[in-house]
Amino acid sequence: MNSDPRPAAASPDDPLAERRIGGERVYDGTLLDVRRDRATMPDGSEAVREYIVHPGAVLVVPVHDDGRMIVERQFRYPHNRSFLEFPAGKLDPGESALESGVRELIEEAGFRAQLWLRLGTIHPVISYSTEAIVLYAARGLVHVGARLDPGEFLELVEYTEPGLQEAIDAGRVTDAKTIAALALYSRWNAAPARSARLRITGRVQGVGYRDWAMRAAALAQLHGWVRNRRDGSVEAHVQGESRACDRFIDDCREGPRACRVERIEIERAPVDAALAGFRLERSD
């Protein structure tokens, strides 16, 4: 088996890199794909590396408009106990992290969401797995009913943000991905200023959405730009005081009367010191 199942090297010139020589699959089960490789070490010696190949996963922090969070209670067989954790699951073949998050939120919690904030990516078991988990927060929840997979059993409970933090401090929540996701979400909420990219999909072109968004952002004294995209969506970069940005994002869920916003994807963006005022940009 000559092909390398690991992600591409982040830095080909890393002096600490271990170079794969070859390897084999030693176990291919329903869940686990276990590999054993031979690799050259930085000093030229050889070593064996055993690890699990993982398709990737997504976690969703579902948040009601009043701030309550949806958490699952689910039995985890290896630990012989139930855990409190946010909805999460593996990516299906050919599925993006966002598509997987939308699917998992419906299947496990029974909700659709209009607003999707990408919190970041974590690597939970860097010593023996390729697993990477993309973390999202989802708002604008609408109940549609859960669609659990066969053999999947769980209970849904709700926490406030302080209540969930208290449960972590007390040791009642120990799931690492849930702790990381809450920390990133809390950091977003606590930040005094925002810089974010928005992608708005739905019936948003040809109905004045772009011009409406520009006026709304200018009234909120935000900096940035907005433009139509060839794929039919509207893209914006907004930068400014957190409460003003959040009000603008909430307003974007409605938009002008003739539009129909299906989804807003939000991703943190570097602060652009050159942004002044709010302007229209050419379509991409």
Language-model-detected regions and their locations in the chain:
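Conserved Nudix-box catalytic region and its N-terminal flanking loop in Nudix hydrolases
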Residues: 2-10, 14-17, 49-52, 58-103, ...
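Unchanged
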Residues: 47, 56-59, 64, 90-176
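Conserved beta-strand segments that form the floor/walls of ligand-binding pockets within enzyme
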Residues: 70, 85, 104-106, 117-118, ...
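Intrinsically disordered, low-complexity, mixed-charge
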Residues: 192-284
